[in-house]
From Swiss-Prot:
Cofactor: how bound: Binds 1 Mg(2+) ion per subunit.
Protein name: Amidophosphoribosyltransferase
Superkingdom, taxonomy of origin: Eukaryota
Species, as recorded: Drosophila melanogaster
EC numbers, comma separated: 2.4.2.14
Domain (Glutamine amidotransferase type-2): residue spans on this chain: 54-302
Length: 546
């Protein structure tokens, strides 16, 4: 597809998203909340540039039910560890494993710490449950789109939480509506849930619903992008799309006195599934493995098992989002057998090889660029020192009341450590540049503190294309890399020089561990670089309007 065609279709896709938000209906009381959240979200996007859509979590107790384990608190702590994946809304749904008519559900707008108190947690009784943190990309902002999403079927209740974004949302929506099923929101999660409520024509269900077959049918219709947790009365299904675009992993809850070994032979107190493994230790769980691309995993009180694996179309390579390593994931999470922090460290090393510069100290924009800065410092032999002090009490969703205060927003978030800065030549590492709104004020802050030179190094390639697979990346016109080359951007933000890590360098850093180990598994790996290269995975249909 030519560049003009991509740009035209990108604009069409953006218009589709605008129509989705315009069509969203809310009650008057919710409208006030939605308006406030909209202002807050806009400010967040302007300050932070990129936002992930969601984090999902599920937990189930083993052994006799009712369990002595407080499942709701386990899920709540799991969601706290995933709060970086979504700060707009959150929710938890639990099941006691007996009555299939209703689940215990609590969800709403806001952060985990404000949504879940003692009263709400007491109502979330159960032996299993799922949870969700959300930042909207499709469906709009508002209470009506909070997850988990619950539907009632002739076979009982079903609750679902989703991370990602359906690339063929419109065709799936038409298919569901053609069956006479009403959709009350524009959320992908409701669409998935309603799709699962209808049995495929070629599946016999004389003995009750065949949920794995229904899930497989949905996966054949929807190539990407999703990681799902689906709760029924007494079990949870963990599902990852066939391209493995979004992360999902399994953990084992072990007894408190189990120690810190691999605990393979230790009886499980329960099982968890999560977008990331970063919260496992805090809930007494141990990382087991990832849910494989196309895999359907069933979790029950007896343990977990693979019930089906759906193959990728035409045996194409998997397409795990490479920006999970760059920006979105927490540094202590594990993807593809390696810690995210280690990959970011390697990105910094590679960045020095590609873009060296004479300097006195290496530093970072806290905190996402810190690991790469350490890698740059180690490879170059230049001392690492902190030059920015972060104000942790300025939230990501701080509403900026005027243009002047908005421009000074960085001053609210950061202070300069002048003793480390004055008279020094600095290399400042950041993970990415989106619109270029933030880095300029930071450079000015450092120069005001006495920096002699400020050289910017970005530990990822230029962002040039939107993402419609669960990441809020703006239109091509808003991305600064499409307006200015590195030299022009350096002058624009007031830096002495600016350079990015190459696409090849990023892929090298991500795949280095497997290649050095001669891991045959690496032959089957692959990463989505669509936001960097414009090469979208999966042979996407025309209706996507890329």
């Amino acid at each position: 597809m030519s560049a003009p065609q991509q740009q035209q279709q990108s604009q069409q896709k953006q218009q589709q998203h605008v129509r989705v938000v315009e069509q969203q209906q809310v009650e008057p009381a919710e409208a006030v909340t939605s308006s406030m959240e909209s202002e807050s979200i806009s400010a967040s996007k302007e300050l932070t540039g990129l936002t992930h859509e969601c984090g999902v979590f599920g937990a189930i107790a083993c052994g006799d039910w009712p369990t002595q384990m407080d499942i709701a608190h386990v899920i709540c702590l799991g969601l706290v560890a995933l709060q970086h994946r979504g700060q707009e809304s959150a929710g938890i749904a639990t099941s006691e494993g007996k009555c299939s008519k209703n689940f215990n559900v609590h969800k709403g707008m806001g952060m985990i710490s404000t949504l879940f108190n003692d009263d709400s947690m007491k109502k979330l009784r159960g032996n299993l449950g799922i949870g969700h943190t959300r930042y909207s990309t499709a469906g709009g902002s508002g209470v009506v789109n909070c997850q988990p999403f619950e539907v009632h079927t002739t076979h009982g209740a079903l609750a679902l939480a989703h991370n990602g974004e359906l690339v063929n949302n419109e065709s799936l929506r038409r298919e569901v509506l053609a069956r006479g099923v009403g959709l009350s929101t524009h959320s992908d999660s409701e669409l998935i849930a309603q799709s699962l409520c209808c049995a495929p024509e070629d599946v016999s269900e004389l003995d009750g619903p065949n949920w794995p077959a229904r899930i497989r049918h949905f996966m054949m219709l929807a190539p990407l992008s999703y990681s799902l947790v689906i709760m029924l009365k007494d079990k949870i299904y963990a599902v990852r799309d066939t391209y493995g675009n979004r992360p999902l992993c399994i953990g084992k809850i072990v007894p408190i006195n189990a120690g810190h070994g691999n605990n393979l032979d230790t009886p499980a107190d329960g099982w968890v599934v999560s977008s990331e493994s970063c919260g496992f230790l805090s809930i007494g769980a141990r990382y087991v493995r990832e849910v494989e691309p196309g895999e359907i995993v069933e979790l029950s009180r007896s343990g977990y098992r693979t019930v089906d694996i759906v193959e990728r179309p035409d045996f194409k390579r998997m397409a795990f989002c490479i920006f999970e390593y760059v920006y979105f994931a927490r540094g202590d999470s594990i993807f593809e057998g390696q810690m995210v922090y280690t990959v970011r460290l390697q990105c910094g090393r590679q960045l020095w090889r590609e873009a060296p510069v004479e300097a006195d100290i290496v530093s970072s924009v806290p905190e996402s660029g810190t690991a790469a800065a350490h890698g740059y410092a180690r490879e170059s032999g230049i001392e690492f020192a902190e030059v920015l002090c972060r104000n942790r009490y300025v939230g990501r969703t701080f509403i900026q009341p005027s243009t002047r205060l908005r421009q000074l927003g960085v001053a609210k978030k950061f202070g300069a450590l002048s003793e480390n800065v004055a008279g020094k030549r600095l290399v400042l590492i950041d993970d990415s540049i989106v619109r270029g709104n933030t880095i300029g004020p930071i450079i000015k802050l450092l120069r005001d503190a006495g920096a002699r030179e400020v050289h910017i190094r970005i530990a990822s390639p230029p962002l040039q294309y939107p993402c419609y697979m669960g990441i809020n990346i703006p239109t091509r016109e808003e991305l600064i890399a499409n307006k200015l080359n590195p030299d022009q951007l350096a002058r624009h933000v007031g830096a002495d020089s600016l350079a990015y890590l190459s696409v090849e360098g990023l892929v090298e850093a991500v795949q280095l561990k497997h290649r050095d180990a001669g891991d045959s598994k690496s032959k089957g790996t692959g990463h989505c670089t669509a936001c960097l290269t414009g090469e979208y995975p999966g042979g996407l249909p025309d209706e996507l309007s890329w």
